Every structure is written in structure tokens, then in C-alpha cells.
Amino acid sequence: MKKISLLGSTGSIGTQTLDIVNQYPDQFQVVGLATRSNVELLATQVQQFRPEIVAICDESKLGSLKDAIASMDYSPLILAGEQGVAEVARHGDAESVVTGIVGCAGLLPTIAAIEAGKDIALANKETLIAGGPVVLPLIEKHGVKLLPADSEHSAIFQCLQGVPDGGLRRIILTASGGAFRDWPVEQLKYVTVQDALKHPNWSMGQKITVDSATLMNKGLEVIEAHFLFGMDYENIDIVIHPQSIIHSLIEVQDTSVLAQLGWPDMRLPLLYALSWPERIYTDWEQLDLVKAGSLTFREPDHDKYPCMQLAYAAGNAGGAMPAVLNAANEQAVALFLAEKIAFLDIPKVIEKTCDNFRDHNRSQPSLEDILEADKWAREAVLMAAEGLGTENKVVSLK
């Protein structure tokens, strides 16, 4: 029985993780739950899974959460704020922590879990993208396992099982192409929020669905792969694979290529991250290659996906630049979802923000440097958005 704490329990990753726990109660037990603000769903989860400790990041919701739990027949420890989430992450009984918090908000609780000696099932890619220079030394110092729980990096990790040290030659990340893979570039100026949220293959949260549409998601995954697997950026490629059956591939030194295949289902990488090195039997739909039909591939259109190149540039710049890229993207996507800027403005404000940070970058940033860069980038995006020409905006900034 593996005891786990779950950060971001009410989001897409969190609810799918709890589906796994519910299906395999003899394998996994939830001892900690944390979320940002969804009191109603968190209370339902507490009632079902009966964790020892619960936290809600939004401190204004603490009273509502306590009221919702008061009528239950047991009393978990209830906390609030960033420190409360960190306490869930470092909770003594947990062996593994699933990090499903969206964005850079997952960095500090993940560090808390690592410092407490917890293994990490990493579904929050921003932890490594922004904090890689700090997180990786901590992983080594505390001797914990860092297991990727997103589909692409789980696929790479699975393909690497049995590959000797030095055997990896190239990583090939597959991308669905997002909501606009079949749209002509000329039509992207007319994109609405509703258009961007129509992912063709995966069921995900709003932010990551927009990231898929811009291909920033894949660019961020390139940076994550660099940190996870120690691969130079020039040896990490992206290919559009519309069917999302091949979740990623590796090329080894003799040019053999290994791939991991499966229906697009986030539970698969989550289960592997929780159960590694074991393989647990599931009754989920098995992959039928005949039913899947043709598997096709094409090169990403650089004109359609400028965010992809911004990510490579930030990765190569190193230091705190990936943190700036990540924060700028989070802020830009939030503005787009709020209809404050247009879809095509997302890469514009990110590029301007990264350019303005270039002279302030440090090659070996501390955690404080990274957090400061994150804060600076969010403010810089707001300023860049204010300076956009009004002809490109969905509505003007308030």
C-alpha cells in the first residue's frame, strides 16, 4: 500500500489521480489533499478518501472548507495558504507526492516535498522549467525519485528502461498540433477563446489546452526533457502526430528508435509514475492498431507556432530565462482567456518580456532569483500587453 499526497486535487491531473486511487484501493491510499480554491469538490474528495491532512491555498476559503468538513464523521487537519499546501507536500505519512498544481505555483510545495524526502510524481512541468537549476541538486542531495507523470516524459522514461548510460542519442516529442493544427496561419487572427479550448484529442485544463494550441506546451516540454534526461536542446526534436497514439520516442546510439504507444489517456502515465517499477493490470481499453488506423507525422509550422522557438531560445539561454518564459506565458494565457489580448498577441508579449530580461539573466540562479524573475515577468507582460496596438486586441485592457 503506497501512501500519497496529492497537490492540485480538484484539477484535471488531481481528479484523474483519484480515479486511479479509487480503482486500486489495495494499492494506493491518499493521506493528503491540497487545492487552490474549489471548496465544494475538495470537500467531496475529503469525504470519499478521508485524508489525514487537507489544505486550500486561497485563505479566504478556509472557513467554508471547515464548515463543509464539520459535519463529517472524522476530522482531518485543515490548513490554508501556501504554507498549508507545503505542509501537505511534506506530510510525514506520504511516500510519494503527486504534483498536479498548474503553473509555477507548484514549485515551492514540490521543493518542500523533496526536502522532506518524498518521491515526486511530476505532473507539474513548470517545477523543472522554472526551477530546474535549484530542483535537480535538491533531488540528488535528498536521494528521492523524480518520476514524470505527463504522457510525453513518461513515454521517454518508459522507453529508456533497459537503455544503458550513454545509450540515448535523441529525444522526439510528439505533439497533437492543438486546436489549430489544420487552420491556415492567415485564419489565426480570428481565433476566439472558445476555439482555442477545443482540443482534438485530450481532455485537459484551460491553460494547458491553450498552451497546446500555441505549441508552447511542447516547447516547455523540451525544456523539461532537457532537465529530466540531461539532453542537449539540439538533440530534442518535436514532430506533429495528429492521432496522439505515439506519446514520444527515443533514438539510441545505433539509430534504433523506441516508442511508447497507447490511447490518449492521462491515467496511464499517472499510474506508471505511482506504481514504478511495477506494472499494474488495468481493465482500460487496450490499444487496437487496426482501429487506430494510420499514424501520421509532419514537421511543425514555425510560422504558425512561434512559441515553440521562443521556448528553445529560452532553454538555450539558461539561467532564469526559462522561468521568465514560463511566467510570461502563464500571464499571457490568462490575459487571452480573459479576452484582454488576442491569440496572436501571446507570443508577442512573451518575446518582448524575454528580450527585456536578457541583460539581467544569471547563469546560476538561486531560488530567490527564480522567484524574483517569475514575479518580474508577470508584471512585464502586463506592461507589454498595455503597449499592444488596439487593432489586435479582443477587447481593450481595463
From Swiss-Prot:
Pathway: Isoprenoid biosynthesis; isopentenyl diphosphate biosynthesis via DXP pathway; isopentenyl diphosphate from 1-deoxy-D-xylulose 5-phosphate: step 1/6. Gene3D superfamilies: 1.10.1740.10, NAD(P)-binding Rossmann-like Domain (3.40.50.720). One of its GO terms (biological process) is isopentenyl diphosphate biosynthetic process, methylerythritol 4-phosphate pathway involved in terpenoid biosynthetic process. InterPro entries: DXP_reductoisomerase (IPR003821), DXP_reductoisomerase_C (IPR013644), DXP_reductoisomerase_N (IPR013512), DXPR_C (IPR026877), DXPR_C_sf (IPR036169), NAD(P)-bd_dom_sf (IPR036291). One of its GO terms (molecular function) is 1-deoxy-D-xylulose-5-phosphate reductoisomerase activity. It holds the Pfam family DXPR_C. It catalyses: 2-C-methyl-D-erythritol 4-phosphate + NADP(+) = 1-deoxy-D-xylulose 5-phosphate + NADPH + H(+). NADPH binds at residues 10-13, 38, 124, 126, 205. SUPFAM superfamilies: 1-deoxy-D-xylulose-5-phosphate reductoisomerase, C-terminal domain (SSF69055), Glyceraldehyde-3-phosphate dehydrogenase-like, C-terminal domain (SSF55347), NAD(P)-binding Rossmann-fold domains (SSF51735). Mn(2+) binds at residues 150, 152, 221. Keywords: Isoprene biosynthesis, Manganese, Metal-binding, NADP, Oxidoreductase. Its cofactor is Mg(2+); Mn(2+). 1-deoxy-D-xylulose 5-phosphate binds at residues 125, 151-152, 176, 199, 212, 217-218, 221. Its EC number is 1.1.1.267. PANTHER family: 1-DEOXY-D-XYLULOSE 5-PHOSPHATE REDUCTOISOMERASE (PTHR30525), 1-DEOXY-D-XYLULOSE 5-PHOSPHATE REDUCTOISOMERASE, CHLOROPLASTIC (PTHR30525:SF0). Belongs to the DXR family. Catalyzes the NADPH-dependent rearrangement and reduction of 1-deoxy-D-xylulose-5-phosphate (DXP) to 2-C-methyl-D-erythritol 4-phosphate (MEP). This is 1-deoxy-D-xylulose 5-phosphate reductoisomerase. It comes from Crocosphaera subtropica (strain ATCC 51142 / BH68). The gene is dxr.
